[in-house]
Swiss-Prot record:
NCBIfam families per UniProt: panB, PRK00311.1
InterPro entries for this protein: Pantoate_hydroxy_MeTrfase (IPR003700), Pyrv/PenolPyrv_kinase-like_dom (IPR015813), Pyrv_kinase-like_dom_sf (IPR040442)
GO BP, one annotated term: pantothenate biosynthetic process
Protein's UniProt name: 3-methyl-2-oxobutanoate hydroxymethyltransferase
UniProt pathway: Cofactor biosynthesis; (R)-pantothenate biosynthesis; (R)-pantoate from 3-methyl-2-oxobutanoate: step 1/2
Membrane-traversing stretches: none
């Protein structure tokens, strides 16, 4: 199948074909997700949570993101690989933000970067786009701002915040973003923003009218069982499968039924 590009996802919006995105953090999972048909693989700073056990995404460093992205890029043949810029890599001087994005593209072989926020990051987005780096925006619940919000509750329920989100979506589009993630906002607002933009929207907890959907792969596969938000659908219970399989292995080792004659030299 042909490789997915930023142009591909734009065409998918125009043709009304929903975009399927998932997070990936390593070679093995990226290879499987790519083969399964995921259009976009997001190397998310959520690796801090599901791979490293942190409570927030803030501890993730740029070097760590580049490492995970390198692993993912080596595992794909088709999917578009988008890499989160972590907290501290773009919030300051726009030149530093551009340098961070350049490192991700050069060292990881990524196809695009993603960053959170609206008006405050527009200049950084413009610098990246001018340099030829595709940028995905992220509005609504932005996990890197959790200590500012104080909660992971739904964002933009009140009209003032909804108006700000509408304006920020337009700002990101005008700055050159090729797509924008809408996280944990009312479905009606997400549908309105999606209709108002010429670029694709990717929803997570934002209803079914966005141009695509993204989930943390560990959540979709039933590996993060201590985190069960309303917007997640479990497509497997791999936690149970893995526990059962390893339990069987341990049992076979204990009773010396593994290895058997066929598994020995």
């Amino acid at each position: 199948m042909p490789r997915v590009t930023t142009k591909t996802v734009q065409e998918m919006k125009e043709e009304g074909v929903p975009i399927a995105a998932l997070t990936a953090y390593d070679y093995t999972s990226a290879r499987l997700l790519d083969r399964a048909g995921a259009d976009v693989l997001l190397v998310g700073d959520s690796a801090a949570n599901v791979m490293a056990g942190h409570e927030t995404t803030l501890p993730m460093t740029l070097d760590q993101m580049i490492y995970h992205a390198q692993c993912v890029v080596r595992g794909i043949d088709r999917s578009l690989v988008v890499v989160d810029l972590p907290f501290g890599a773009y919030q300051g001087d726009p030149t530093e933000a551009l340098d961070s994005a350049i490192r991700v593209m050069k060292e990881a072989g990524a196809h695009a970067v993603k960053l959170e926020g609206g008006a405050p990051v527009v200049e950084a987005v413009e610098r990246m786009v001018t340099a030829g780096i595709p940028v995905m925006g992220h509005l609504g619940l932005t996990p890197q701002s959790i200590y500012d919000y104080g909660t992971y509750q739904v964002r933009a329920r009140d009209e003032e915040e909804a108006d700000e989100l509408r304006a920020d979506a337009k700002r990101l589009e005008e700055a050159g973003c090729f797509a924008v993630v809408l996280e944990k906002i009312p479905a009606e607002l997400a549908a309105e923003v999606t209709a108002s933009l010429s670029i694709p929207t990717i929803g997570i907890g934002a209803g079914d009218q966005t141009d695509g959907q993204v989930l943390v792969s560990h959540d979709a596969l039933g590996l993060s069982t201590d985190f069960e938000p309303r917007f997640v659908r479990r497509y497997a219970r791999l936690d149970e499968t893995i526990i059962d399989a390893i339990g069987a292995y341990v049992s076979d080792v204990r009773d010396r039924s593994f290895p058997d004659e066929d598994e020995s030299y």
